[in-house]
Amino acid sequence: MALWGGRFTQAADQRFKQFNDSLRFDYRLAEQDIVGSVAWSKALVTVGVLTAEEQAQLEEALNVLLEDVRARPQQILESDAEDIHSWVEGKLIDKVGQLGKKLHTGRSRNDQVATDLKLWCKDTVSELLTANRQLQSALVETAQNNQDAVMPGYTHLQRAQPVTFAHWCLAYVEMLARDESRLQDALKRLDVSPLGCGALAGTAYEIDREQLAGWLGFASATRNSLDSVSDRDHVLELLSAAAIGMVHLSRFAEDLIFFNTGEAGFVELSDRVTSGSSLMPQKKNPDALELIRGKCGRVQGALTGMMMTLKGLPLAYNKDMQEDKEGLFDALDTWLDCLHMAALVLDGIQVKRPRCQEAAQQGYANATELADYLVAKGVPFREAHHIVGEAVVEAIRQGKALEDLPLSELQKFSQVIGEDVYPILSLQSCLDKRAAKGGVSPQQVAQAIAFAQARLG
């Protein structure tokens, strides 16, 4: 039976019921709905709606239902209830009879669902933070094992300057640390309880909402009932965090997809995260990474969809808000899955150091070092830049690296160049000179690894 049937003289059209019902997705809030109902039953004792004995009976029945749901969650989807609130209330009435009908006193589904969703978000943020830190740790471990793996760094997908695979790993540690911070910030703002705000104007019972919030593990209660039942900022914030986090994972995936190509050949992915071709026997495809990259789009879509859903809504609750859950559930599930999969990709990745070094020595990645050398000799940087550009053209014409040009050739471009230029052009020198904070020098990379290890514990 619907929770609102008394006002109506005709039954809902079955097509409308199917269109309107949300149990097929909000069943995921079952545990939170039951936990919230236990807390609400305690609050009803404080205002005389329930006796202590009645509350104990309700709490016992709800706890039995909670264990039953955990053991067999699929039972919920076997029901034709409108939503998870109706399902829980119906099951409670089955267990305790008329007493179960007293539980909803002073409560609306508007504050109830807002509370359920916030509780679910808190639980899920905890899972995301754990997975995020696990991936950071995997990246730090990979960095530690590859501090001396020199490879080309890229701008515009053109070889630019030499870096190390460790430095590349640590770049993604920084991105993930920002993702972690965004989740922690979002958690602070969603950690306020809307329960007790009723449909929109507040409850008519003098319930201590701060005490109620504490029972549910919230930091405090919300301050405005109208805002509380309308607020979905926490959904937008988490979707935004997920969208940004998935962009980072997509870039991570794209880098490794490129590094894994035959053309680059910098890494070899484990058989555990790759698949083959049904036609071409030689293929080993980076499917895990391609799926991470591909799933980024659906998360961006969820954020955009929720923005558009909320942008024109008047206060307070509107049924449009039922659309907040499917996109949120899918986006955070996707982000969590991709965090786990990215860590699995790193577990077993092989860095092909000789090929990385060979590539770093190609493409004139040491050209900037020659320009800096000229600057140290008193040549203005813009002039040095032009001189080195001409030297690179000549080296390309001869099919040689800069360091393979004889001194006589180099001096055609500038007489200040001496024999001391050759050590400067080595890969190790290129790395060693980047010793400012955040640079690619071995000392800076080692410090960055130590800092990340200390932060992650």
From Swiss-Prot:
It holds the Pfam family ASL_C2. Its EC number is 4.3.2.1. Gene3D superfamilies: Fumarase/aspartase (C-terminal domain), Fumarase/aspartase (Central domain), Fumarase/aspartase (N-terminal domain). Pathway: Amino-acid biosynthesis; L-arginine biosynthesis; L-arginine from L-ornithine and carbamoyl phosphate: step 3/3. SUPFAM superfamilies: L-aspartase-like. It catalyses: 2-(N(omega)-L-arginino)succinate = fumarate + L-arginine. The keyword Nucleus does not apply. The keyword Plastid does not apply. One of its GO terms (biological process) is arginine biosynthetic process via ornithine. HAMAP family: Arg_succ_lyase. Belongs to the lyase 1 family. Argininosuccinate lyase subfamily. This is Argininosuccinate lyase. It comes from Escherichia coli O1:K1 / APEC.
